Regions:
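N-terminal transmembrane-helix/juxtamembrane module of multi-pass inner/ER membrane proteins
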Residues: 1-73, 108-127
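Aromatic-anchored segments of alpha-helical transmembrane domains
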Residues: 27-32, 98-106, 165-178
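Hydrophobic alpha-helical transmembrane segments of integral membrane proteins
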Residues: 94-120, 179-193
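Short helix-capping/hinge motifs at transmembrane helix termini and TM-loop junctions
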Residues: 35-39, 84-85, 111-115, 154, ...
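Interfacial segments of alpha-helical transmembrane regions
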Residues: 14-24, 77-103
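Hydrophobic, aromatic-rich transmembrane alpha-helices
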Residues: 74-85, 142, 146-150
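Membrane-embedded catalytic cores of phosphoryl/pyrophosphoryl-handling enzymes
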Residues: 3, 7, 120-212
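Membrane-helix interface segments
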Residues: 57-58, 86-90, 154-160
Length: 212
């Protein structure tokens, strides 16, 4: 009886991860199609101008926030998890970050969308970034970190912590003038897709590579 319940629960989780992966793929495809056109228009242009135009009083706050989506921030998150002796979780987090970031880098070259300072005038460029803009690597990394750690966060707080964490990192990229809204949407989609894909892998395979 207990085994049947466990199997049913596992199937339910797999169905959720498959649905999440498919949705992430669709969102990414739609965002990539629009981003490939280059300059932002409509709502994307308005949102970028509005957030990028916030006062300089936000600078130090968002400079700290954006760190958590950086390469160093990713490394720090893995080290912290490893320090808690959750070795398999740390390994899974590291592999997912590497895989997702690799996908984001490939997508940047394929889509070829330039940064805001190259496409618009009057951008408040508060940070310097090189390379293409879509999708956002910071949005990708922060999403992977948040959703990989989701099951280990307090149940009453995870629904607030995860969206807040990802949302603030994404806002920081717009405020600093290094990404457009569709860039961070694409990054979130890559992150969710990567986390979901890892969980969809057969249990035996996950155990073999020591991520489960």
């Amino acid at each position: 009886m207990t085994k049947n319940i466990e199997n049913s629960s596992e199937k339910g989780r797999n169905a959720l991860y498959i649905a999440s992966f498919c949705l992430a793929l669709l969102v990414f495809a739609a965002a990539a199609f629009l981003a490939a056109k280059g300059k932002p228009t409509g709502w994307e242009y308005s949102w970028f101008r509005s957030i990028n135009g916030w006062s300089e009083g936000w600078y130090h706050f968002f400079t700290v926030v954006t760190f958590f989506g950086s390469t160093l921030g990713a490394l720090l998150s893995v080290i912290v998890v490893f320090a808690t002796r959750a070795y398999r979780l740390a390994w899974r987090l590291a592999l997912t970050i590497i895989g997702a970031y690799g996908i984001a880098l490939v997508a940047k070259h394929v889509i070829g969308r330039a940064r805001p300072v190259e496409l618009l005038t009057g951008v408040h460029a508060r940070a310097v970034e090189t390379g293409m803009g879509f999708p956002s690597g910071h949005a990708t990394v922060s999403t992977v970190i948040a959703f990989t750690l989701w099951p280990y966060l307090p149940k009453k707080l995870r629904y607030a912590i995860v969206p807040l964490f990802i949302g603030l990192v994404c806002l920081s990229r717009l405020y600093l003038g290094v990404h457009f809204p569709l860039d961070v949407v694409g990054g979130i989609a890559v992150g969710i897709g990567a986390v979901s894909f890892i969980r969809i892998l057969p249990q035996a395979f996950r155990k073999r590579i020591r991520i489960s």
